[in-house]
UniProtKB/Swiss-Prot annotation:
InterPro entries in the cross-refs: FAD/NAD-bd_sf, Flavin_mOase, Flavin_mOase-like, FMO-like
Broad EC category: oxidoreductase
The name this protein goes by in its record: Flavin-containing monooxygenase FMO GS-OX2
Chain's role: Catalyzes the conversion of methylthioalkyl glucosinolates of any chain length into methylsulfinylalkyl glucosinolates.
GO biological process: glucosinolate biosynthetic process
One Pfam assignment: FMO-like
Consequences of knocking out this gene: Increased accumulation of methylthiobutyl, -pentyl, -heptyl and -octyl glucosinolates in leaves and seeds.
Protein family per UniProt: Belongs to the FMO family.
Alphabetical UniProt keywords: FAD, Flavoprotein, Monooxygenase, NADP, Oxidoreductase
Alphabetical list of SUPFAM superfamilies matching this protein: FAD/NAD(P)-binding domain
Lineage top rank: taxon: Eukaryota
Length: 457
């Protein structure tokens, strides 16, 4: 839409969550002139990047009375994209040579990502906006504004009114557990990757890992360091897939999907192979869930599609007072959070206008129809994949901010190609030095780094 003709408006906005999305949302809202309060349940900023050795009391996270742990980070986790493309556009995620405790690798550990987010919060004085150890209990629309009930870790309740709510609570807390015929009578151990931390508990076991992308690829190889055998069940594989991989201890196999589990401990794959397993690890993703949010029926979640959202951000009937930052998964997440946040901030200040409710609903219906036409299931509505660059550039144009850099887009493309073709080595061996050079020269030209690019290159 064209820039709005209305006078600039300052809103009182609450941001739910102080992870990467919440932090950059708070910054962009504040830059736009809004007053901002961030509500965060943890004791520090960082969201899902805060590692905890604790796991939930229910390893599958199905028991509604379980003790909930919000981190899904495992001890050995490293990023699956180069650090240059991960950072916010004006605060590069580059090595900190002034601190020997920091991880300077191009694909660093989860601890380095958390440290980067803490650096970002300090640089822009974001922590002064954050109320820590606050759980959001309920959010609902009231007379054109939003009422937010929350409580402290000590049980003290708060009831406040805001002009707008920006939901940045993430979507890595409610695990999705794949259905396996016969699993109820299967006698072995079961755990979702949300509760996986270290491989030790699987020593000398035969383990089946369901899922072979990102966490599945990582965790299967982590467990294979100590397990007797690890068998990966991959939905992306052909039905007759059966391949032995020589790493890390010549004890890792890739299969097609699981067909059935039996009470004698056996797992039968669709390729006909039978494995007697001790444990199953589900690396099968997560569900969107917003238990605190009351929208009077305007929104719902259907097969993991959050309905209805204009461009994955604004629910037409409740916009612009309610918005979501960070729903789409995969790709350049931090930059997506930043661009979406700029859009939300500009819309709330009336510097940019949204289409009418009817026009937004028409756009959503057309989007759903396009997914149906090519056979994409509802559960993949928020997986942008190859169209993420097009999506981000559209949002950037809406709010008048720069488009995503060429080098950043290409690092994503080539990074994922390496991940698929060389899952064992892609983090430490790469073939895109040209893109890394382009990135650091870009940082230097914009005066975003204090060292010469040759120090890295």
């Amino acid at each position: 839409m064209a820039p709005a003709q209305n006078p600039i408006s300052s809103q009182h906005v609450v941001v739910i969550g102080a992870g990467a999305a919440g932090l950059v949302a708070a910054r962009e809202l504040s830059r736009e002139g809004h007053t901002v309060v961030v509500l965060e349940r943890e004791k520090e900023v960082g969201g899902l990047w805060i590692y905890s050795p604790k796991a939930e009391s229910d390893p599958l996270s199905l028991d509604p009375t379980r003790s909930i742990v919000h981190s899904s980070v495992y001890e050995s986790l490293r990023t699956n994209l180069p650090r240059e493309c991960m950072g916010f556009t004006d605060f590069p995620f580059v090595p900190r040579f002034d601190d020997e405790s920091r991880d300077s690798r191009r694909y660093p550990s989860h601890m380095e990502v958390l440290a980067y987010l803490q650096d970002f919060a300090r640089e822009f004085n974001l922590e002064e906006m954050v109320r820590f150890e606050i759980e959001v209990v309920r959010v609902e629309p009231v007379n054109g504004k939003w009422r937010v009930w929350s409580k402290t870790s000590g049980g003290v309740s708060h009831d406040e009114i805001f002009d707008a709510v920006v939901v940045c609570s993430g979507h890595y807390t409610e695990p999705n557990v794949a259905h396996i015929p016969g699993i109820k009578s299967w006698p072995g151990k079961q755990i979702h990757s949300h509760n996986y931390r270290v491989p030790g508990p699987f020593e000398n076991e035969v383990v089946v890992v369901i899922g072979n992308f990102a966490s599945g690829a990582d965790i299967s190889r982590d467990i294979a360091k100590v397990a007797k055998e690890v068998h990966i069940a991959s939905r992306a594989s052909e039905f007759d897939t059966y391949e032995k991989l020589p790493v890390p201890r010549n004890n890792l196999w890739i299969h097609s999907e699981i067909d059935t589990a039996y009470e004698d401990g056996s797992i039968v794959f669709k390729n006909g192979k039978v494995v007697y397993a001790d444990s199953i690890v589900y690396c099968t993703g997560y569900k969107y869930r917003f238990t605190f949010l009351e929208t009077n029926g305007y929104m719902n979640i259907d097969e993991n599609r959050v309905e209805h959202l204009y461009k994955h951000v604004f629910p037409p009937a409740l916009s612009p007072g309610l918005s979501f930052v960070g729903l789409p998964s995969m790709g350049i997440q931090f930059v997506m959070f930043e661009i979406q946040s700029k859009w939300v901030a500009a819309v709330l200040s009336r510097r940019v206008t949204l289409p009418t409710e009817d026009k937004m609903m028409e756009d959503i219906s057309a989007w759903y129809a396009s997914l149906d036409a090519v056979g994409i299931p509802k559960r993949y509505t928020h997986k942008l994949g190859k169209i993420q660059s097009e999506y981000l550039n559209w949002v950037a144009e809406e709010c008048g901010c720069p488009l995503v850099e060429h080098w950043r887009n290409q690092q994503i493309v080539r990074g994922y190609q390496r991940l698929v073709s060389h899952p064992e080595t892609y983090r430490d061996e790469w073939d895109d030095n040209d893109l890394m050079e382009e990135a650091y020269e870009d940082f230097a030209r914009k005066k975003l780094i204090s060292f010469h690019p040759s120090h890295i290159l």
